[in-house]
């Protein structure tokens, strides 16, 4: 199963390069939530005429809000790798608890296992595919697993300074993911 997943990731990366070439893009960045892309082994790679920049999207607690920081040109350090592993274990544990909460609350089996990379969108899709009386993705978040939902389980994320320190040693450039999503976009941008 893991070999199949790794092959699927490689196929997805190959498809990204095809699409970049079709769009006449010279470079693309590849990031994932709180983990490194497993098929990229260097901060910058060339594939079929496309420059691929490896990065990471790391959620941090900035006090007044949680921010998703994008870091590019990633060269993992031991400290960052340890933190990413801790975060991934927390995501698995959180996913398991979310699944249990939703199954108990709705009285259904989601036929979903907690695993690395599992997030609330996966759980929402499982609810839609279950016998539960839901047919809209957003309603699952609004009613069940959103930040104020009865099944919500918070994530354990590093504070801003810890994230900044870990990533400044491992990455060349920083950005803010989806800056207009935040309640205070200017405050979010001022952190970067």
Model-predicted regions and their roles:
Residues 1-11, 90-192:
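Domain-core and long-helix interface of multi-subunit machines
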Residues 1-65, 144-146, 170-192:
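An N-terminally biased module of ancient metal coordination in phosphate/nucleic-acid-related enzymes
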Residues 2, 24, 28, 77-80, ...:
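Generic, low-specificity signal for short hydrophobic/alpha-helical stretches with a mild N-terminal bias
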Residues 46-47, 51-53, 66-101:
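Conserved, surface-exposed functional patches that form binding/active-site neighborhoods
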Residues 61-86, 129-149:
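Active-site gating loops and adjacent loop-to-helix segments of metal-dependent hydrolytic enzymes
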């Amino acid at each position: 199963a893991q070999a199949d997943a790794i092959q699927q990731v490689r196929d997805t990366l190959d498809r990204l390069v095809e699409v970049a070439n079709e769009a006449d893009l010279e470079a693309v960045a590849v990031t994932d939530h709180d983990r490194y892309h497993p098929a990229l082994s260097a901060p910058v790679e060339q594939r079929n005429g496309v420059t691929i920049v490896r990065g990471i999207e790391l959620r941090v607690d900035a006090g007044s809000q949680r921010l998703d920081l994008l870091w590019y040109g990633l060269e993992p350090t031991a400290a960052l790798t340890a933190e990413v592993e801790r975060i991934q274990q927390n995501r698995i544990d959180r996913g398991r608890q979310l699944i249990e909460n939703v199954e108990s609350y709705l009285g259904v089996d989601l036929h979903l296992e907690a695993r690395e990379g599992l997030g609330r969108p996966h759980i929402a899709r499982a609810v839609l595919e279950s016998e539960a009386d839901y047919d809209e993705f957003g309603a699952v978040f609004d009613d069940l697993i959103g930040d104020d939902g009865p099944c919500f389980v918070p994530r354990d994320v590093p504070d801003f300074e810890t994230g900044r320190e870990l990533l400044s040693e491992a990455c060349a450039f920083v950005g803010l993911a989806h800056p207009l999503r935040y309640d205070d976009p200017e405050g979010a941008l001022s952190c970067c």
